[in-house]
Amino acid sequence: MAVSRWKAVGSTLLAAFLVGLVVLIAVLLIRTYTLPTAVRKWNRNESLITELAEKERKQLVEALKGAIRIPTVSFSEEEQNTTALREFGEYIQKVFPQVFSSSLIQHEVLGGYSHLFKVQGSDHNLLPYMLLAHIDVVPAPPESWEVPPFSGEERDGYIYGRGTLDDKNCVIGILQSLEFLLKRGHKPRRSFYIGLGHDEEISGHKGAQKIVEKLQSQGVKLAFVLDEGLAVLDGVIQGISQPVALVGTTEKGSVTLDLTVNRLPGHSSMPPSETSIGILAAAVSRLEQNMMPNMFGNGPEQDMFEHLSTKFDFPLNIIMANLWLFSPILSRILELSPSTNAIVRTTTALTIFKAGIKSNVIPPTATATVNFRLHPAQTVQEVLDIVQNTIKDERVELSVLNSFDPLPVSPNDMSLGYHILQRTIHDVFSGPPVAPGVCVGNTDSRHFVNLTNSIYRFSPVVLKKEDVDRIHGLNERISKEAIELLVQFYIQLIQNSDTDNIPPPHLDTHEL
């Protein structure tokens, strides 16, 4: 009797489990294949100016080559190639005569080498917007490059050189698009600004910040800001076979710390039990071994995966459409790669270590510099508290060299700027899915937070996996086709921005 009862209970439990499992699978599949996505149905305006003549294609390629040949390198906040920066200002005046002579455009130089343009629109009731790019580039030691990094050499359909992807492509693209539109007699309805900073790679304090101060003094407010950032990624996101456009709606914050240990000096023949180097090495080792907490789901990164859920291959599409269940698993998977780990947490990077001058002298001081890139859900103070609690050694002194909190998350639902950007991406890049993302690096746009709540970071280029490492790396390059599309993007964006409304959202469902 007892055995029979237990068998009956066991059968009931098994049946309940199987029913629950079937229900769970049904819920997962229904959400996966019917999850609605809010999209806006744009009607492409065929009357817009978009096509480029063969002569214009050659002009824009030569314009970029010439820009690359000017080595506008930012070495540090104290050292820039100011001769090259001055030369670059002269160069763009020569290459874009319509931009610098049009009665619609006001131009001024700020901070010595940065450029601010105002393009006057016909409708003063429309809030202006801002296009940003930067003139300066990071250093490019010629060793291991296939071509000299400042040659602007063309090879196999690609233009090589430092700045072809970051960010002279956008500088030339913006100015060239405006030049072509002016030649065609185009007069914008909505006013807009163009800001070209000269020190983005070293903080933007003398360039972009001066532009912001100028606009604030005039009481300017902006509908949106578009700066460099994410891109159309082709084969970069594992599990998605089609190109995907990611628009940065925020960027991580940053804290740079000096960790210092001071001890008595001595001779290596009579070493103490602990030295400044040993104490500091133990401290930075604790920081590396104890990563900052995984913050997946507390910032906009989850939004990105949900937006793209229907684009993932099976079975990843089920996981992405059901993050209410699978987010703990996904967050652990994302930790496994440095590129995706940077999305889910504040990263810790030991960048400089200084100690000692002689092999037989125990140094009194050891210093390490550590850079943290802050997840959007954390603040500078929270990170400093975690660092203190992780090191747990009063002999290690902390000093903040520079810091700023993560940028506010810009809207991607009812924002005019986001949907103009989305529309332009669809027009130019043949309709890839568009999703919000997080910029793990920093841009000049961070200085503009008091002028608008809509800041977007998107570079209008298609990047394959092998292209990503070229940015700030070896053999940076861009194809001639890509630079043509980039110019067409800005031409289209300027014209699309003349609207004063956006279409209502429609629910795009993927039915079983």
UniProtKB/Swiss-Prot annotation:
It comes from Xenopus tropicalis. Pfam families: M20_dimer, Peptidase_M20. Residues 1-34 form the signal peptide. Pathway: Amino-acid metabolism; Energy metabolism; electron transfer; Lipid metabolism; fatty acid metabolism. Zn(2+) 1 binds at residues 166, 201, 472. One of its GO terms (cellular component) is extracellular space. The keyword Metal-binding applies. It catalyses: an N-acyl-L-amino acid + H2O = an L-alpha-amino acid + a carboxylate; an N-acyl-aromatic L-alpha-amino acid + H2O = an aromatic L-alpha-amino acid + a carboxylate; N-(5Z,8Z,11Z,14Z)-eicosatetraenoyl-glycine + H2O = (5Z,8Z,11Z,14Z)-eicosatetraenoate + glycine; N-hexadecanoyl-L-phenylalanine + H2O = hexadecanoate + L-phenylalanine. It is found in: Secreted. Its EC number is 3.5.1.114, 3.5.1.14. GO terms for molecular function: aminoacylase activity; hydrolase activity, acting on carbon-nitrogen (but not peptide) bonds, in linear amides; lyase activity; metal ion binding; peptidase activity. Keywords: Glycoprotein, Hydrolase, Lipid metabolism, Lyase, Metal-binding, Protease, Secreted, Signal, Zinc. Glycans are attached at residues 45, 81, 450. The active site is at residues 136, 200. Zn(2+) 2 binds at residues 134, 166, 227. Secreted enzyme that regulates the endogenous N-fatty acyl amino acid (NAAs) tissue and circulating levels by functioning as a bidirectional NAA synthase/hydrolase. It condenses free fatty acids and free amino acids to generate NAAs and bidirectionally catalyzes the reverse hydrolysis reaction. Some of these NAAs stimulate oxidative metabolism via mitochondrial uncoupling, increasing energy expenditure in a UPC1-independent manner. Thereby, this secreted protein may indirectly regulate whole body energy expenditure. It is an enzyme of class 3 (hydrolase). Lipoproteins are powerful coactivators of PM20D1 activity in vitro and NAA biosynthesis in vivo. This is N-fatty-acyl-amino acid synthase/hydrolase PM20D1. Belongs to the peptidase M20A family. GO terms for biological process: adaptive thermogenesis; amide biosynthetic process; amide catabolic process; amino acid metabolic process; energy homeostasis; fatty acid metabolic process; lipid metabolic process; proteolysis.
